Design a protein with these regions (language model features):
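Structural signature of Gram-negative outer-membrane beta-barrels, strongest in the C-terminal barrel
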Residues: 419, 425-427, 452-596, 632-634, ...
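Short loop/turn motifs that connect adjacent beta-strands in outer-membrane beta-barrel proteins
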Residues: 28, 164-169, 193-196, 232-234, ...
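Gram-negative outer-membrane beta-barrel transporters
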Residues: 476-480, 593-595, 615-727, 812-814
Length: 815
């Protein structure tokens, strides 16, 4: 009923708006020019010496009808990977550029930082259908130009909001497809009122059952804007809200449980399970250990049916009802007040005040966990009062309340010789982390702990100040040569205190005890950049050198496990590129060498809520070549492609591995310390090993047919092998994969019935039904008493797969 009301309201507003409309283009030149002023501070200047990919408004609007998150559109550009937990591209999704994950990618909206200050990542599940609100995106690979917020260590994503239309109009859309996935939405603009004022709004929502069991969810966004515009000045208020309740699968698809791995070779077994496809073939392709567990027989062995498929069953609460699912619940509201002024033909300026409030929590069922892992304050909770019980089921609620506010300001000067931008950004973050146990299956423990209906087991506060100032200038040396220089100073102060959500194992007391956080870290970073560019006719060439620094993120302090305290990292990025374009064909190549000091690299491990964990390595690098090409075969048929070929290495790497046996009397064991669970650690050294999650080849090919109202796009992508840790071990890796998608659209004018046009679309994904995983995690250990030496470790892999063939149809009505 609520969805029907929303759609009716959107349709009504659109119809009222069209009654006032004129037959004219809705996006005026002056609005576009003023929007360029707003984003100028973070977008690469024309002819600046950096590698970029631009995504236009039309592509963004078409993509918005799929319900997928933005990373899946970005993955069509060179060197970019995307994946999502539920297998469909909706909800919890992730992004990598040149092998660097979300927390290393700077993201802004109209120059305002979007990265979570503590985690330094953008949570794309909280940005569902954002593409419908955008007028353009620029992806800068490498360090790129100076920006606001966290340092770019793989790339920068600069989002530009869609300019409000000066002509009244609107649209509504509906999409439906596989796994009961549907997207509804609409947008409207009042057009220009009283020659100066525009009110516009939008609402979009995506629902899905999810491919992976227990990942059904609902997420969406809403937008309301008020714009005052004059010929050279505009002031605009944007309120963008996001909501989500999405089923989680951060454990991914696993071969077994916490105690037993079904991966081939563990404990000497020959299961034949090495890849995600192998799991799919034994009935575990959609298995989610956050939602269900293996079925056991009377002897404690896994049950299989007549076809050899492993059987699973839902978790059950004390009242006999099945546990619904593990969910991520989050609400976020962005408020941005921006002003832009074209002062004269040389000078322009823009300023934005921003405030974001967010609140949310995970809710998760923990099956048969050790009671002492709750970090309880007294030994009595592990004694006779519990009837000797050592394990219990429990539900935890881990949450965050946060407020972020700040100012972004830019001043720009441009004449025939100079293009200069000065920028200032200050931002303050205040957050509170909390965790409650809301259910315990052990009656005695519930009576002792949950006197008020729940038990708070951690609480901590956090504050982070982030400020930067920069100036960048492009100087036209001649008609064909430009010089570029960019200097940025950035100051960061991060504080947190209180109890962590992780507990420390006390070997003497055989208990887990609370871990108190007391962090006060300050960083001062100087980030210079310089380069040259050449342009003549269709030829363009550039070379640049850029330095960037980045502070550790929150989980580097709270989840660093076996590794020493985290350090800030730095990156020296060398880039060189050439491109040539004619009216019919175009081609380009970019060479890069990214040299890291103390890079925080992914270890293949994850936190207990699915965050990828990282650790410092002293010397590492990423180097490669990125190729693009396109040819217009006819006016209605185009072939395009891009390729990213790379080498990603750690020069010297020390790995710490759990040893389940007692190594106290073994002189050959290079012990480091205990891991917090009472297991000893062994240290192994590697030279020139491949960085985790860094495929050596990412390829994309497109065939685009467009004739009158018809459009069809064929897209085939290929990703080479990815190692899940930094040891370059093939057993702990994801095989290469290739997928093909087809998108079809037809635009039908319907002005005779009061509709500007109707757009019908069909999106066909993975048409050859490939069974593959595009991300994952790994755990490995040594247990020589069970035959698991370092060369033959016990290991468990969590595979993050994509669904097989899926389809979605859509219809959009524009007024």
């Amino acid at each position: 009923m609520n969805k029907k009301i929303v759609m009716a309201a959107l349709l009504g507003m659109s119809v009222m708006a069209v009654n006032a409309a004129n037959e004219a283009d809705g996006d005026s030149l002056r609005m576009e020019q003023l929007q360029e002023v707003v984003v100028k501070g973070v977008w690469v200047q024309k002819n600046a010496p950096f590698a970029v990919a631009n995504i236009k408004k039309d592509e963004l609007q078409k993509f918005s009808k799929t319900g997928k998150e933005l990373p899946f559109l970005f993955s069509q550009t060179p060197g970019v990977l995307a994946w999502g937990e539920n297998g469909l591209g909706t909800g919890t999704s992730y992004l990598r550029i040149r092998g660097a994950g979300d927390s290393r990618i700077n993201v802004t909206l109209d120059g305002v930082p979007l990265n979570s200050p503590e985690d330094q990542a953008v949570f794309w599940a909280n940005m569902n259908s954002y593409s419908s609100l955008l007028g353009g995106v620029q992806i800068q690979r490498g360090v790129g130009t100076s920006t606001n917020g966290d340092g770019a260590f793989g790339g920068t994503v600069a989002l530009s909001s869609k300019t409000p239309s000066e002509k009244a109009g609107g649209e509504v859309n509906f999409s439906y497809g596989s796994y009961n996935t549907f997207n509804v939405g609409g947008a409207f603009s009042t057009g220009l009122l009283w020659n100066h004022l525009i009110f516009d709004g939008a609402y979009h929502e995506t629902n899905t059952d999810g491919y992976i069991h227990g990942t059904s969810g609902r997420s969406g966004s809403y937008y309301g804007g008020l714009t005052w515009i004059d010929d050279k000045f505009t002031i605009r208020y944007k309120n963008i809200g996001n909501f989500e309740k999405t089923g989680q699968a951060w454990n991914a698809v696993t071969a077994g449980n916490d105690d037993l791995s079904l991966m081939d070779g563990t404990y000497g077994s020959k299961t034949g399970i090495k890849t995600y496809k192998d799991l799919y073939d034994v009935g575990l392709g959609r298995y989610n250990s956050l939602y269900e567990h293996f079925t056991y027989d009377a002897d404690g062995k896994f049950v299989r049916d007549a076809n050899g498929n492993y059987q699973t069953e839902r978790y059950v609460m004390n009242n006999g009802e099945p546990w619904d699912k593990t969910t991520d619940n989050f609400w976020q509201n962005h408020n941005i007040l921006s002003a832009a002024w074209n002062i004269n033909e040389n000078w322009s300026t823009t300023a934005s005040l921003h405030y974001t409030h967010g609140y949310g929590y995970y809710k998760e069922f923990r099956y048969d966990n050790k009671i002492k892992k709750l970090g309880l304050p007294s030994p009595e909770f592990n004694g006779d009062a519990l009837g000797g019980a050592k394990r219990t089921d429990w539900v935890r609620k881990k949450g965050l309340k946060q407020d972020t506010y700040g100012l972004v300001w830019n001043i720009n000067y441009k004449d025939n010789d100079w293009d200069v931008i000065g920028g200032l950004s200050v931002q303050q973050f205040d957050g509170n982390h909390f965790g409650y146990v809301t259910y315990l299956s052990n009656d005695a423990l519930r009576t002792l702990l949950m006197k008020n209906g729940d038990y708070q087991y951690y609480d901590s506060d956090a504050k982070k100040f982030d400020g930067n100032v920069f100036i960048k200038a492009l100087y036209h040396l001649t008609d064909n040569w430009d010089a570029f220089a960019d200097i940025q100073y950035r100051h960061v102060n991060y504080k947190t205190d209180g109890y962590n959500d992780k507990f420390i194992y006390d070997e003497d007391a055989y208990l887990y005890k609370k871990h108190y956080l007391d962090i006060n870290e300050k960083h001062n970073f100087f980030n210079p950049k310089a380069g040259f560019s050449f342009h003549n006719g269709g030829h363009r060439a550039f070379a640049s050198l850029a330095l960037s620094h980045r502070e550790p993120e929150r989980n580097n302090y709270t989840d660093n496990g076996n590794y020493p305290a985290p350090k800030a990292e730095s990156l020296l990025d060398y880039e060189m590129g050439y491109s040539y374009a004619t009216p019919k064909w175009r081609a380009g190549a970019t060479l890069y060498y990214m040299n890291y000091d103390n890079q925080l690299v992914q270890t293949g491990a994850k936190s207990d809520i699915g965050e990828p964990l990282t650790a410092n390595v002293k010397d590492s690098y990423r180097t490669g070549i990125e190729l693009t090409a396109g040819y217009d075969i006819t006016p209605w048929l185009t072939v395009e492609g891009n390729a990213a070929l790379s080498i990603n290495k750690i020069k010297d790497f020390d790995e710490f591995v759990e040893d389940w046996d007692d190594w106290k009397d073994n002189p050959d064991a290079a012990k480091y310390h205990c891991d917090g669970n009472g297991d000893e650690l062994r240290q192994f050294h590697y030279d020139n090993s491949t960085l985790a999650f860094s495929p050596s080849a990412i390829l994309n090919g497109f065939l685009n047919f467009h004739y009158k109202g018809w459009q069809a796009v064929w897209h085939t992508g290929y990703v080479s092998r990815q190692y899940l840790d930094n040891t370059e071990n093939k057993d702990r890796s994801l095989p290469a994969y290739s997928t093909t998608n087809v998108n079809l659209n037809y635009t039908l004018p319907l002005k005779a019935i009061g509709v500007k046009e109707a757009i019908f679309g069909v999106n066909l994904s993975n048409i050859f039904n490939a069974r593959y995983a595009n991300s994952g995690w790994v755990y490995s250990a040594i247990a020589e008493s069970y035959g698991h030496t370092n060369d033959n470790r016990y290991y468990q892999i969590g595979f993050v797969p994509s669904a097989g063939f899926t389809a979605m149809g859509s219809i959009t009505l524009r007024f």
